[in-house]
């Protein structure tokens, strides 16, 4: 959550 750009999982 909040890191979808970095971790799209």
UniProtKB/Swiss-Prot annotation:
Q: What is this protein called?
A: Unknown protein 6
State the source organism's domain of life.
Answer: Eukaryota
């Amino acid at each position: 959550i909040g890191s979808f750009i970095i971790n799209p999982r």
